[in-house]
Amino acid sequence: MGRDTILEIINSIRNADRGRKRVVRITSTNITENFVKILFIEGFIENARKHREKNKYYFTLTLRHRRNSKRPYINILNLKRISRPGLRIYSNSQQIPLILGGIGIVILYTSRGIMTDREARLKGIGGELLCYIW
């Protein structure tokens, strides 16, 4: 049985966010590199650094948090995995869903790599819906 790297990334970030951790360490692959690049460009993470440790590459992600001592902690990352190994969900460019009226993003795996819903609509291509982020 293969690993679901997208689910590992989502769970690591979600668990760190809920546990009020500021830094997350994930293994580096081509898919995770593209996924992290999208999260950084869209402003969901503050910093991403790639480093090597014992012949393996890792990403160290710094999450954005809204912490205030007077108010309770607010989760800013809501991630939901859509397509999974047992049930792949595909969409063409016209039927890519809008998340919160365009505030959130959909990350797709297309024939031209991993991209956001906005990029896919502009290029007119569809693909596999990986996750929703809002």
From Swiss-Prot:
GO terms for biological process: translation. Pfam families: Ribosomal_S8. It comes from the Eukaryota. Its main location: plastid. It is found in: Plastid. Keywords: Plastid, Ribonucleoprotein, Ribosomal protein, RNA-binding, rRNA-binding. GO terms for cellular component: plastid; ribonucleoprotein complex; ribosome. Disulfide bonds: none annotated. One of its GO terms (molecular function) is rRNA binding. One of the primary rRNA binding proteins, it binds directly to 16S rRNA central domain where it helps coordinate assembly of the platform of the 30S subunit. HAMAP family: Ribosomal_uS8_B. Part of the 30S ribosomal subunit. Belongs to the universal ribosomal protein uS8 family. This is Small ribosomal subunit protein uS8c.
